[in-house]
Design a protein with these regions (language model features):
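Cytosolic regulatory regions of ion transport systems
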Residues: 1-180
């Protein structure tokens, strides 16, 4: 019996069929039927709800822009739902997860996880299901960003570059305000 759990973990990691089978019984893998339909069209799909995803969601909330969260961490999805926001649990590089996030009617896909291969898969799926979707991706290195840009996968952001731009903007603005 001790081998069952590791075998299940291995099967889910290596088989889309096993992941789909696992999702059938997971109530967090689909949006509740009570989800307001106006939230399911023209929305932003935010993949990953770590620090970056939460910050993006906060800005979207301030601007009253609808979004759906897709995250592989069940506890995160539960917390998002408790906060009254729509969220689905699962690996968003699996088409089922993006379908559950209503990617077919979404205006934008925002991928905050720094996984180049998974990001590419998510964009491919999203564009097949919704050819006019806009995509925004996070890259963890300039090399990864260059690969994503070369393949025209969307607007690409690298954390260190964005931080440097923000700091430089602040410094130059403060220094320009000083006399002399």
């Amino acid at each position: 019996f001790a081998a069952i759990e590791p075998a299940q973990v291995w099967a889910r990691a290596h088989s889309a069929w096993a992941r789909r089978l696992d999702l059938r019984d997971d109530p967090l893998a689909a949006l509740p039927m009570t989800t307001d339909r106006k939230l399911l069209s023209g929305q932003v799909v935010v993949v990953g709800f770590g620090r970056i995803g939460r910050h993006i969601a906060s800005v979207l909330d301030e601007r009253h822009i609808h979004y759906i969260v897709a995250d592989s961490n069940r506890e995160v999805v539960e917390a998002v739902r408790r906060a009254g926001k729509p969220a689905v649990s699962g690996d968003a590089s699996d088409p089922i997860v993006l379908v559950q996030a209503h990617i077919t009617k979404a205006a934008m896909l925002v991928v905050t996880v720094p996984d180049t291969i998974a990001s590419r898969q998510m964009v491919d799926i999203a564009r097949k299901l919704n050819p006019h979707i806009e995509t925004v991706l996070r890259a963890d290195t300039e090399d990864a960003a260059e690969l994503l840009r070369r393949d025209k996968l969307g607007e690409i952001f690298v954390g260190e570059q964005e931080l440097a731009r923000g700091m430089a903007r602040h410094v130059s603005g403060r220094m320009a305000a000083q006399p002399g």
